[in-house]
Regions:
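Soluble ligand-binding/transfer domains with enclosed cavities or grooves
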Residues: 2-180
Length: 180
């Protein structure tokens, strides 16, 4: 689950919201990663993995019947042997419903930074862990709609014993490229 505070810079107003987000890790060789590579004119052999993200949410200013449900897939192509930076392939962007390529990098605090430039706008996101079951995310969008958001995302585990083990270990044993 995700709690979000979005700041609309043009209107000088803030809006609260919540989302339910599902992140599924995609391993090298997954047919869905091959599709992403083809759509972005990249070699599938270069993709090391990725994820499929689905979400459903609501914002305070929503009108009746307005929906914030969607999904996207990501594929990662590292730029060097460390794997800490490289090309981020999406089957479609947030702003445009066409395949888009951006960049990913891990910063010195192991935060994941995603940057994507679109025709009329650009986005910058940073993800990091504040605890074994708490991920934080900031994002800014510049261009047609200038806004900034901060999200607290709480991992929901199906198995209570796994939740206790993850909490006592301090961090999950294996993190997917986009967390959890």
């Amino acid at each position: 689950t995700s709690q979000r505070s979005q700041h609309h810079l043009l209107h000088r107003r803030a809006e609260a919201g919540a989302s339910f987000i599902v992140v599924e890790e995609l391993h090298k060789g997954d047919a869905r990663l091959a599709e992403i590579a083809e759509r972005n004119n990249e070699s599938v052999e270069r993709i090391i993995g990725g994820c499929w993200v689905r979400w459903s949410g609501s914002m305070a200013w929503d009108r009746a019947g307005e929906s914030h449900e969607d999904q996207t897939m990501f594929g990662l192509i590292p730029s060097d042997d460390s794997g800490r930076s490289g090309l981020l392939l999406r089957d479609r962007g947030y702003a445009e419903k066409a395949p888009v390529a951006g960049e990913f990098r891990m910063d010195e605090e192991n935060g994941l930074i995603l940057t994507t430039d679109y025709e009329m706008m650009s986005s910058l996101e940073r993800f990091w862990f504040a605890g074994p079951n708490l991920r934080l995310r900031t994002s800014t969008v510049q261009g047609l709609s200038n806004n900034a958001s901060f999200c607290m995302e709480t991992r929901q585990l199906d198995d209570p014993a796994a939740a206790m083990a993850a909490a006592s270990a301090g961090m999950p044993g294996a993190l997917a490229p986009f967390g959890w």
